[in-house]
């Protein structure tokens, strides 16, 4: 029986989960090496492999609590420690952590930050200080995840789409990206921007505003904002995000991206 079938049957209760132990171990190993991904782009569309999430959830059930020593520091967890970061060409600055079952391509730099199980981080990406890449999040190549950013994770429900950040995006300081949000290639989020499934993203660069939910288009320059909403007790300003400009090859190569962002009043 294939590993996928063993894992799906064990999660559904049709097979004793002990029978799936070796299948779960092999699957988490493959996630760790980057041979399998919880989500991947196929013909331009992102596909979620639910059974890999089930494998992670089963690993929590099957794993035994084990003391982990790091000098004078002691931890207690069910997941073993990743032990081949130098061989994978990944730089992790103490006390940063990439959890076993997450994969970072060569050239990734992780400052004192955290990358959770099931996540995938593309080559050349920087995960800056105190940033978090949540479980199963998919981060592209040459992405900058600035200090204090929270990239949400999701394991349940298994069919839920994880947060996806495409290649060359810039996620500014203290941004929050959760609930399966999709950040398009080359997009820029200004500092403190929050992107979730329920917060509107409003493009104000055209004659008429265009609203998005949980999706930032490629090359969009986005800042945090508010918009008025009227309730029986009065008018309040609720959180939203505004697309105020667009990144282009011209800005990157000739004018300079930083200069363009300053013109727009965007802080990173």
Report the location of each language-model feature:
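Structural signal for interior beta-strand "rungs" in well-ordered beta-sheet cores
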Residues: 90-230
